[in-house]
């Protein structure tokens, strides 16, 4: 059994110092992320996962706009809903209890915790869980994962929920 700190360290990707970078806004680049988390350049899907992961590593949200941000430039892109989709999950046993780990469409693992909570938002007229990430980003829980969670969810007077690190996250 591992400690929560060890699990967080294992899952953590190197964080960019976006707060320290103050580049000029250099305009818009024709990159769009559709509602399924697919990345497009000029209308053509970017199929190389390494390229998408590179772009994702410099992606941030400021106010209501998404940007690819580096120390020297900041380019706006279009995001239809959110840039990432939760496509898989697992529980990890820690000294602090079971931790819910979510895997996004880029095969990156994220720990559901107070720092990265599941929040309910509207998507296509339905209340859906989203995982809140750093730098204003979020990942929508896929329908498949949602139904898997529904099968194991607990309930109380507020509704159905799933637990991570002894905290309840409501599914609807």
What positions do the PLM features span?
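Long, non-globular segments of proteins
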Residues: 1-172
